[in-house]
Every structure is written in structure tokens, then in C-alpha cells.
């Protein structure tokens, strides 16, 4: 693998505003919630740990039995997305996505043991 870093842990939440308020009270740096794809998202910075909160996973319609709330996936940066996907069962993607807080990335989600997924990402452009 040519993994170059961990981007974040993704968590699905039902009450995004309530969870954002919780992390702000806990002293985390939290970005404002924003619309993204099929739901809303917010980034949480807890020292060395980054979380991304989602109200709906982009791959939610493609994965059976996804919980209403809880851990979704670990997002990993790579310098060769195509090589990372080789040998994995792809759940969603690859696709180029953009957002104001993360720039432009090429991403793909694959199944992993433990009823979770891995997200492999190539950063194409930094946020402006």
C-alpha cells in the first residue's frame, strides 16, 4: 500500500447540530455544518484526531444494514488510488468530489472486515 496519511474517521449522526455543540463544549475545533451530496457534514479537530460527521454516507444506498448512527469508515490518503483499489470489493466510486472545507479529491470506498469500509483518497486540489 502507498498510504500517505490518515485523513479522518467518519461517523454518522442523526442530530448534526447537537453533536457539533457537544464537541464545541468539549473544546474541539469544529467547522460549521455544510450541505454535501446527499446530506450534511461537519469536520471536528480533536488535537491529532480528525472526525468527519455525516448525516448520510455517500454510499448509504449501496450498503445494506448501515446503522442509523455510528462509525462509518476510516479515510486514508494515497498517492495511487488505482493501486489501492486493486483486489478490493468496491462499494462506491471512484469519483471526483469537491467541497469548500476539503478541496477536490478522487475517492473510492471499499469493504473491510468488521462491517466497516475504507475510503482511499487522492488529493487533487487543496481547499481555496
Positions of the model-derived regions?
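Vicinal oxygen chelate
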Residues: 2, 42-43, 86-128
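N-terminal beta-strand motif that seeds the catalytic metal site of vicinal oxygen chelate
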Residues: 1-18, 71-74, 124-128
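Core segments of cupin and vicinal oxygen chelate
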Residues: 11-51
Amino acid at each position: 500500500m502507498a498510504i500517505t496519511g490518515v485523513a479522518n474517521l467518519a461517523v454518522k449522526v442523526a442530530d448534526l447540530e447537537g453533536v457539533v455543540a457537544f464537541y464545541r463544549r468539549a473544546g474541539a475545533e469544529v467547522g460549521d455544518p455544510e450541505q454535501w451530496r446527499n446530506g450534511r457534514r461537519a469536520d471536528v479537530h480533536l488535537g491529532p484526531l480528525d472526525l468527519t460527521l455525516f448525516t448520510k454516507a455517500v454510499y448509504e444506498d449501496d450498503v445494506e444494514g448501515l446503522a442509523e448512527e455510528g462509525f462509518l469508515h476510516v479515510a486514508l490518503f494515497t498517492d495511487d488510488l488505482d493501486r489501492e483499489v486493486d483486489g478490493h470489493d468496491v462499494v462506491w466510486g471512484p469519483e471526483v468530489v469537491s467541497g469548500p472545507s476539503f478541496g477536490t479529491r478522487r475517492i473510492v470506498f471499499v469493504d473491510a472486515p468488521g462491517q466497516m469500509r475504507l475510503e482511499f483518497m487522492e488529493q487533487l486540489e487543496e481547499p481555496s
